[in-house]
Protein backbone atom coordinates (compact mmCIF):
# COMPACT_ATOMS: atom_id res chain seq x y z
CA UNK A 1 0.00 0.00 0.00
CA UNK A 2 2.91 2.32 0.75
CA UNK A 3 4.32 1.65 -2.74
CA UNK A 4 0.97 2.58 -4.24
CA UNK A 5 0.87 5.82 -2.28
CA UNK A 6 4.44 6.72 -3.32
CA UNK A 7 3.68 5.90 -6.95
CA UNK A 8 0.54 8.05 -6.78
CA UNK A 9 2.40 11.01 -5.22
CA UNK A 10 5.20 10.87 -7.81
CA UNK A 11 2.70 10.73 -10.67
CA UNK A 12 0.79 13.68 -9.25
CA UNK A 13 3.91 15.85 -9.27
CA UNK A 14 5.20 14.85 -12.72
CA UNK A 15 2.01 14.80 -14.81
CA UNK A 16 -0.68 17.34 -15.57
CA UNK A 17 -3.19 15.24 -13.59
CA UNK A 18 -5.77 15.21 -16.38
CA UNK A 19 -8.18 12.29 -16.28
CA UNK A 20 -9.09 10.54 -19.53
CA UNK A 21 -11.59 8.10 -18.03
CA UNK A 22 -12.81 6.72 -14.71
CA UNK A 23 -12.70 3.02 -13.87
CA UNK A 24 -15.01 2.02 -11.05
CA UNK A 25 -15.02 -1.35 -9.29
CA UNK A 26 -18.33 -3.17 -9.13
CA UNK A 27 -18.24 -3.24 -5.32
CA UNK A 28 -17.91 0.55 -5.15
CA UNK A 29 -20.80 0.95 -7.59
CA UNK A 30 -23.00 -1.34 -5.49
CA UNK A 31 -22.19 0.66 -2.35
CA UNK A 32 -23.09 3.92 -4.07
CA UNK A 33 -26.32 2.49 -5.50
CA UNK A 34 -27.36 1.05 -2.14
CA UNK A 35 -26.68 4.31 -0.29
CA UNK A 36 -28.45 6.50 -2.87
CA UNK A 37 -31.57 4.33 -2.95
CA UNK A 38 -31.74 4.20 0.84
CA UNK A 39 -31.59 7.99 1.11
CA UNK A 40 -34.04 8.52 -1.77
CA UNK A 41 -36.77 6.83 0.28
CA UNK A 42 -36.34 9.65 2.83
CA UNK A 43 -36.15 12.34 0.11
CA UNK A 44 -32.58 13.12 1.23
CA UNK A 45 -29.55 13.83 -0.92
CA UNK A 46 -27.02 11.00 -0.60
CA UNK A 47 -23.34 11.97 -0.62
CA UNK A 48 -20.13 10.09 0.04
CA UNK A 49 -16.38 9.93 -0.53
CA UNK A 50 -14.59 8.06 -3.33
CA UNK A 51 -11.33 6.22 -2.68
CA UNK A 52 -8.79 4.93 -5.17
CA UNK A 53 -5.72 6.04 -7.13
CA UNK A 54 -4.62 7.41 -10.50
CA UNK A 55 -2.86 5.09 -12.97
CA UNK A 56 -1.80 6.43 -16.39
CA UNK A 57 -4.48 9.15 -16.55
CA UNK A 58 -7.10 6.64 -15.43
CA UNK A 59 -8.84 7.33 -12.14
CA UNK A 60 -9.50 3.99 -10.47
CA UNK A 61 -12.29 4.06 -7.88
CA UNK A 62 -11.90 1.01 -5.69
CA UNK A 63 -13.96 1.89 -2.62
CA UNK A 64 -16.32 4.47 -1.15
CA UNK A 65 -18.13 5.33 2.06
CA UNK A 66 -21.11 7.62 2.84
CA UNK A 67 -20.93 10.98 4.53
CA UNK A 68 -22.82 11.39 7.82
CA UNK A 69 -26.19 13.09 7.60
CA UNK A 70 -26.08 16.87 7.85
CA UNK A 71 -28.77 16.88 10.54
CA UNK A 72 -26.38 15.40 13.10
CA UNK A 73 -24.74 18.52 14.60
CA UNK A 74 -22.52 16.52 16.95
CA UNK A 75 -20.74 14.78 14.06
CA UNK A 76 -17.47 16.29 12.82
CA UNK A 77 -17.48 15.38 9.11
CA UNK A 78 -13.77 16.02 8.55
CA UNK A 79 -12.78 13.93 11.57
CA UNK A 80 -15.20 11.22 10.47
CA UNK A 81 -13.63 11.01 6.99
CA UNK A 82 -10.08 10.93 8.37
CA UNK A 83 -11.04 8.18 10.83
CA UNK A 84 -12.61 6.03 8.10
CA UNK A 85 -9.64 6.43 5.75
CA UNK A 86 -7.20 5.69 8.58
CA UNK A 87 -9.01 2.45 9.42
CA UNK A 88 -9.17 1.44 5.76
CA UNK A 89 -5.43 1.94 5.54
CA UNK A 90 -4.91 -0.44 8.45
CA UNK A 91 -6.68 -3.25 6.57
CA UNK A 92 -4.66 -2.58 3.39
CA UNK A 93 -7.50 -0.97 1.40
CA UNK A 94 -6.99 1.95 -0.98
CA UNK A 95 -7.49 5.01 1.19
CA UNK A 96 -6.52 7.89 -1.13
CA UNK A 97 -9.31 10.44 -1.49
CA UNK A 98 -10.06 10.89 -5.22
CA UNK A 99 -13.46 12.58 -5.22
CA UNK A 100 -17.02 12.25 -4.04
CA UNK A 101 -20.42 11.07 -5.20
CA UNK A 102 -24.01 12.17 -4.79
CA UNK A 103 -27.49 11.18 -5.88
CA UNK A 104 -29.39 13.13 -8.50
CA UNK A 105 -32.64 15.03 -8.05
CA UNK A 106 -35.17 14.28 -10.84
CA UNK A 107 -32.32 13.57 -13.24
CA UNK A 108 -30.75 16.99 -12.79
CA UNK A 109 -27.51 17.27 -10.84
CA UNK A 110 -26.29 20.76 -11.80
CA UNK A 111 -26.57 23.09 -8.82
CA UNK A 112 -24.65 25.83 -7.02
CA UNK A 113 -23.81 23.46 -4.14
CA UNK A 114 -22.39 20.89 -6.58
CA UNK A 115 -20.29 23.57 -8.28
CA UNK A 116 -18.88 24.89 -5.01
CA UNK A 117 -18.13 21.44 -3.60
CA UNK A 118 -16.36 20.24 -6.73
CA UNK A 119 -14.34 23.47 -6.88
CA UNK A 120 -13.02 22.89 -3.35
CA UNK A 121 -12.31 19.22 -4.13
CA UNK A 122 -10.58 19.91 -7.43
CA UNK A 123 -8.40 22.73 -6.08
CA UNK A 124 -7.24 20.61 -3.14
CA UNK A 125 -7.18 17.22 -4.95
CA UNK A 126 -6.50 18.05 -8.59
CA UNK A 127 -7.52 14.66 -10.03
CA UNK A 128 -10.80 14.43 -8.10
CA UNK A 129 -14.13 13.81 -9.82
CA UNK A 130 -17.76 13.87 -8.78
CA UNK A 131 -19.86 10.82 -9.65
CA UNK A 132 -23.60 11.44 -9.98
CA UNK A 133 -26.08 8.58 -9.68
CA UNK A 134 -29.64 9.09 -10.98
CA UNK A 135 -31.90 7.05 -8.70
CA UNK A 136 -35.14 7.62 -10.65
CA UNK A 137 -33.75 6.66 -14.05
CA UNK A 138 -31.88 3.68 -12.62
CA UNK A 139 -35.04 2.42 -10.90
CA UNK A 140 -36.62 2.12 -14.37
CA UNK A 141 -33.88 -0.24 -15.53
CA UNK A 142 -31.28 2.19 -16.93
CA UNK A 143 -28.10 2.43 -14.86
CA UNK A 144 -27.28 6.15 -14.91
CA UNK A 145 -23.83 6.78 -13.45
CA UNK A 146 -21.85 9.79 -14.71
CA UNK A 147 -18.54 11.38 -13.71
CA UNK A 148 -17.80 15.11 -14.02
CA UNK A 149 -14.92 17.54 -13.55
CA UNK A 150 -14.90 21.32 -13.58
CA UNK A 151 -13.47 22.87 -16.73
CA UNK A 152 -10.38 25.13 -16.46
CA UNK A 153 -12.54 28.15 -17.35
CA UNK A 154 -14.96 27.42 -14.51
CA UNK A 155 -12.09 26.99 -12.02
CA UNK A 156 -10.52 30.27 -13.14
CA UNK A 157 -13.85 32.07 -12.82
CA UNK A 158 -14.31 30.73 -9.30
CA UNK A 159 -10.76 31.70 -8.33
CA UNK A 160 -11.36 35.26 -9.53
CA UNK A 161 -14.71 35.37 -7.74
CA UNK A 162 -16.11 37.40 -10.63
CA UNK A 163 -19.50 36.20 -11.90
CA UNK A 164 -20.45 39.29 -13.88
CA UNK A 165 -21.63 39.10 -17.51
CA UNK A 166 -18.27 40.50 -18.65
CA UNK A 167 -16.41 37.70 -16.85
CA UNK A 168 -18.60 35.05 -18.49
CA UNK A 169 -17.97 36.59 -21.92
CA UNK A 170 -14.22 36.94 -21.35
CA UNK A 171 -13.74 33.35 -20.17
CA UNK A 172 -16.37 32.05 -22.65
CA UNK A 173 -18.20 30.20 -19.90
CA UNK A 174 -21.77 28.96 -20.28
CA UNK A 175 -23.86 26.30 -18.62
CA UNK A 176 -22.59 23.78 -21.17
CA UNK A 177 -18.94 24.51 -20.28
CA UNK A 178 -19.08 24.51 -16.48
CA UNK A 179 -18.54 20.75 -16.21
CA UNK A 180 -16.79 18.26 -18.46
CA UNK A 181 -18.17 14.72 -18.47
CA UNK A 182 -15.54 12.01 -18.04
CA UNK A 183 -16.22 8.53 -19.50
CA UNK A 184 -16.82 5.97 -16.78
CA UNK A 185 -16.45 2.20 -17.03
CA UNK A 186 -17.32 -0.50 -14.50
CA UNK A 187 -14.82 -3.30 -13.94
CA UNK A 188 -15.36 -6.54 -12.05
CA UNK A 189 -12.90 -9.23 -11.05
CA UNK A 190 -12.82 -12.47 -13.09
CA UNK A 191 -14.41 -14.38 -10.20
CA UNK A 192 -17.26 -11.88 -10.09
CA UNK A 193 -17.82 -12.23 -13.84
CA UNK A 194 -17.95 -16.04 -13.50
CA UNK A 195 -20.45 -15.79 -10.66
CA UNK A 196 -22.63 -13.35 -12.65
CA UNK A 197 -22.63 -15.74 -15.61
CA UNK A 198 -23.78 -18.60 -13.38
CA UNK A 199 -26.48 -16.47 -11.76
CA UNK A 200 -27.71 -15.35 -15.17
CA UNK A 201 -28.37 -18.97 -16.12
CA UNK A 202 -30.41 -19.50 -12.94
CA UNK A 203 -32.68 -16.51 -13.52
CA UNK A 204 -36.05 -17.24 -15.15
CA UNK A 205 -36.43 -16.06 -18.72
CA UNK A 206 -38.06 -12.65 -18.97
CA UNK A 207 -41.10 -12.76 -21.23
CA UNK A 208 -40.97 -9.01 -21.80
CA UNK A 209 -44.52 -8.11 -20.83
CA UNK A 210 -43.49 -4.63 -19.65
CA UNK A 211 -41.58 -3.56 -22.74
CA UNK A 212 -44.55 -1.55 -24.00
CA UNK A 213 -45.39 0.04 -20.66
CA UNK A 214 -45.56 3.79 -21.27
CA UNK A 215 -45.13 4.74 -17.61
CA UNK A 216 -45.94 8.42 -18.18
CA UNK A 217 -47.69 9.03 -14.86
CA UNK A 218 -44.89 10.11 -12.54
CA UNK A 219 -41.77 10.54 -14.67
CA UNK A 220 -43.13 13.10 -17.10
CA UNK A 221 -45.07 14.88 -14.36
CA UNK A 222 -41.97 15.32 -12.18
CA UNK A 223 -39.87 16.51 -15.09
CA UNK A 224 -42.51 19.02 -16.19
CA UNK A 225 -42.98 20.34 -12.65
CA UNK A 226 -39.24 20.83 -12.21
CA UNK A 227 -38.99 22.45 -15.64
CA UNK A 228 -41.74 24.96 -14.79
CA UNK A 229 -40.04 25.83 -11.49
CA UNK A 230 -36.70 26.41 -13.20
CA UNK A 231 -38.29 28.58 -15.90
CA UNK A 232 -39.92 30.73 -13.20
CA UNK A 233 -36.54 31.13 -11.48
CA UNK A 234 -34.87 32.09 -14.76
CA UNK A 235 -37.63 34.64 -15.41
CA UNK A 236 -37.00 36.26 -12.03
CA UNK A 237 -33.27 36.42 -12.78
CA UNK A 238 -34.03 38.01 -16.16
CA UNK A 239 -36.24 40.63 -14.50
CA UNK A 240 -33.45 41.53 -12.05
CA UNK A 241 -30.90 41.83 -14.84
CA UNK A 242 -33.23 43.98 -16.97
CA UNK A 243 -33.75 46.34 -14.02
CA UNK A 244 -29.97 46.58 -13.61
CA UNK A 245 -29.55 47.45 -17.29
CA UNK A 246 -32.25 50.12 -17.06
CA UNK A 247 -30.57 51.71 -14.04
CA UNK A 248 -27.17 51.65 -15.78
CA UNK A 249 -28.64 53.20 -18.93
CA UNK A 250 -30.35 55.93 -16.91
CA UNK A 251 -27.14 56.66 -15.00
CA UNK A 252 -25.08 56.83 -18.20
CA UNK A 253 -27.60 59.23 -19.74
CA UNK A 254 -27.47 61.53 -16.71
CA UNK A 255 -23.67 61.39 -16.65
CA UNK A 256 -23.36 62.33 -20.33
CA UNK A 257 -25.85 65.16 -19.81
CA UNK A 258 -23.87 66.45 -16.81
CA UNK A 259 -20.58 66.22 -18.73
CA UNK A 260 -22.08 68.10 -21.68
CA UNK A 261 -23.34 70.80 -19.33
CA UNK A 262 -19.92 71.00 -17.67
CA UNK A 263 -18.21 71.30 -21.06
CA UNK A 264 -20.46 74.25 -21.94
CA UNK A 265 -19.77 75.92 -18.58
CA UNK A 266 -16.02 75.36 -18.98
CA UNK A 267 -16.16 76.98 -22.41
CA UNK A 268 -17.75 80.07 -20.86
CA UNK A 269 -15.16 80.09 -18.06
CA UNK A 270 -12.34 79.81 -20.59
CA UNK A 271 -13.69 82.78 -22.55
CA UNK A 272 -13.75 84.79 -19.32
CA UNK A 273 -10.28 83.62 -18.34
CA UNK A 274 -11.54 81.71 -15.31
CA UNK A 275 -10.19 78.25 -14.28
CA UNK A 276 -12.19 75.28 -15.58
CA UNK A 277 -13.78 72.56 -13.47
CA UNK A 278 -12.26 69.07 -14.06
CA UNK A 279 -14.54 66.31 -15.32
CA UNK A 280 -13.59 64.11 -12.36
CA UNK A 281 -15.79 66.29 -10.14
CA UNK A 282 -18.83 65.20 -12.16
CA UNK A 283 -17.75 61.59 -12.64
CA UNK A 284 -17.36 61.13 -8.86
CA UNK A 285 -21.05 61.90 -8.44
CA UNK A 286 -21.98 58.79 -10.45
CA UNK A 287 -20.74 55.65 -8.76
CA UNK A 288 -20.51 52.57 -11.00
CA UNK A 289 -23.32 50.10 -10.47
CA UNK A 290 -22.43 46.63 -9.21
CA UNK A 291 -23.19 44.05 -11.88
CA UNK A 292 -25.52 41.26 -10.74
CA UNK A 293 -24.26 37.74 -10.15
CA UNK A 294 -25.02 35.70 -13.27
CA UNK A 295 -23.88 32.34 -11.91
CA UNK A 296 -27.34 31.45 -10.60
CA UNK A 297 -28.94 32.28 -13.96
CA UNK A 298 -26.32 30.19 -15.77
CA UNK A 299 -26.93 27.18 -13.53
CA UNK A 300 -30.71 27.56 -13.92
CA UNK A 301 -30.31 27.64 -17.71
CA UNK A 302 -28.33 24.41 -17.53
CA UNK A 303 -31.05 22.79 -15.42
CA UNK A 304 -33.70 23.85 -17.95
CA UNK A 305 -31.64 22.39 -20.79
CA UNK A 306 -31.22 19.09 -18.92
CA UNK A 307 -34.93 18.81 -18.13
CA UNK A 308 -35.82 19.60 -21.75
CA UNK A 309 -33.46 16.89 -23.01
CA UNK A 310 -34.89 14.33 -20.58
CA UNK A 311 -38.46 15.20 -21.58
CA UNK A 312 -37.62 14.99 -25.29
CA UNK A 313 -35.90 11.62 -24.83
CA UNK A 314 -38.73 10.24 -22.72
CA UNK A 315 -41.43 11.45 -25.11
CA UNK A 316 -39.65 10.00 -28.16
CA UNK A 317 -39.44 6.59 -26.46
CA UNK A 318 -43.08 6.77 -25.34
CA UNK A 319 -44.27 7.77 -28.83
CA UNK A 320 -42.42 4.83 -30.35
CA UNK A 321 -44.05 2.48 -27.83
CA UNK A 322 -47.43 4.09 -28.53
CA UNK A 323 -47.23 3.46 -32.27
CA UNK A 324 -46.06 -0.13 -31.70
CA UNK A 325 -48.92 -0.71 -29.26
CA UNK A 326 -51.41 0.75 -31.75
CA UNK A 327 -50.17 -1.58 -34.49
CA UNK A 328 -50.41 -4.62 -32.21
CA UNK A 329 -53.90 -3.61 -31.10
CA UNK A 330 -55.07 -3.17 -34.70
CA UNK A 331 -53.64 -6.57 -35.63
CA UNK A 332 -55.37 -8.15 -32.63
CA UNK A 333 -58.73 -6.58 -33.54
CA UNK A 334 -58.38 -7.66 -37.16
CA UNK A 335 -57.66 -11.21 -36.05
CA UNK A 336 -60.69 -11.26 -33.75
CA UNK A 337 -63.06 -10.01 -36.48
CA UNK A 338 -62.02 -12.87 -38.71
From Swiss-Prot:
Known partners and oligomeric status: Component of the eukaryotic translation initiation factor 3 (eIF-3) complex. The eIF-3 complex interacts with pix. Interacts with mxt.
GO terms under cellular component: eukaryotic 43S preinitiation complex; eukaryotic 48S preinitiation complex; eukaryotic translation initiation factor 3 complex
SMART domains: JAB_MPN
One of the protein's GO biological processes: formation of cytoplasmic translation initiation complex
The protein, known as: Eukaryotic translation initiation factor 3 subunit H
Domain MPN residue range list: 22-154
Example of a GO MF term: metallopeptidase activity
Protein function: Component of the eukaryotic translation initiation factor 3 (eIF-3) complex, which is involved in protein synthesis of a specialized repertoire of mRNAs and, together with other initiation factors, stimulates binding of mRNA and methionyl-tRNAi to the 40S ribosome. The eIF-3 complex specifically targets and initiates translation of a subset of mRNAs involved in cell proliferation.
Stated family: Belongs to the eIF-3 subunit H family.
Highest taxon above the source species: Eukaryota
